[in-house]
């Protein structure tokens, strides 16, 4: 299979380390995710501020999604919580946003800079979590389970 071929030759393109995570899917536009194999992924490691509970973080994430859902440029958002094999993770959890193009990512950046998105993000950084700042990755899905 194509997946076996990718796994067999992975050392030619980089060092791979396999991790086990718990994933909390916050928003997934399944038709958009299935439409293309193209992915632009923005990740950001965060750690709750002292005294902020998991329930408070969940409530903040849920309220942000409810207020922003009609403005989303991403086709997916998940919170990833490291489990096995993550002794040196860069935080307690990671925001994982999926875009279907660089254009969608840039529309999101424009919304943050000019459309009111920055206020919610700054509130999150000030009151809820210390975060590393976003990193962006671009690529394509090599193998889908249905193939």
Q: Which sequence ranges carry the predicted segments?
A:
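Short S/T/G/P-rich N-terminal loop/turn motif that feeds into the first structured element of a domain
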Residues: 1-147
